[in-house]
Amino acid sequence: MTIRVGVLGARGKVGQAICAAVRAADDLELVAEVDKGDALETFTETGTEVVVDFTHPDVVMGNLKFLVEHGIHAVVGTTGFDAARLDEVRGWLAASPATGVLIAPNFAIGAVLSMRFAEQAARFFESVEVIELHHPNKADAPSGTAYRTAGLIAEARNRAGVGRSPDATSTELDGARGADVDGVRVHSVRLAGLVAHQEVLFGTQGETLTIRHDSIDRSSFAPGVLLGVREIGKRPGLTVGLDPFLDL
């Protein structure tokens, strides 16, 4: 039995890649392609079961509210989710307990693994910094992936009793040392020619470790998205991150 899939942000670069991947999958049927200016009611009219959202932080909450209220599962790659937004989504889902929502900062399998590797390495090194690099049209900084990575690193270091990275900086230009995410410095680069890239730099006495992931094409997101589409109907409520779907 095929799953009826809709895509929000269908005319965007990622959206186009996801539409192509859904069309190529034997067990999925692309029934709705919706973008800016199109009616969300298209999903109810076409009997869409799962919607993939790659839109913009400014509109994603309205999209999700509509989908949850209509019992449509959602797989969300749009970034900009903080704790308050996630709690709001949980509130909507409480009134629609059979509906599932997956929100992931990154759907590239390698990126998900790199976040897990960084979490595992965090307690063994004195210093750590995160550098994320993206195309110049990205709306948010730091990226959702970098924000999530820094949070996982900070939690792992706190559990292990590891203190903040040493830093004797006493004067700096505003922003020169990057953003502080739970005690982990995060730096954002925006450069034409890039897609999505991240480095986590660890250092301690006598050695360094670099964990790097590169998405060189937006098709790298498709396997993770399709996994989410296939599984979200079995997981009511809110899932944050692709990790549970990969048994990590």
Curated annotation (Swiss-Prot):
Family designation: Belongs to the DapB family.
Name of the molecule in the record: 4-hydroxy-tetrahydrodipicolinate reductase
Subcellular location: Cytoplasm
Single Gene Ontology MF annotation: NAD binding
Catalytic activity: (S)-2,3,4,5-tetrahydrodipicolinate + NAD(+) + H2O = (2S,4S)-4-hydroxy-2,3,4,5-tetrahydrodipicolinate + NADH + H(+); (S)-2,3,4,5-tetrahydrodipicolinate + NADP(+) + H2O = (2S,4S)-4-hydroxy-2,3,4,5-tetrahydrodipicolinate + NADPH + H(+)
Main subcellular localisation: cytoplasm
Enzyme class: oxidoreductase
Binding-site list for (S)-2,3,4,5-tetrahydrodipicolinate: 135, 144-145
Entry-linked SUPFAM superfamilies: Glyceraldehyde-3-phosphate dehydrogenase-like, C-terminal domain, NAD(P)-binding Rossmann-fold domains
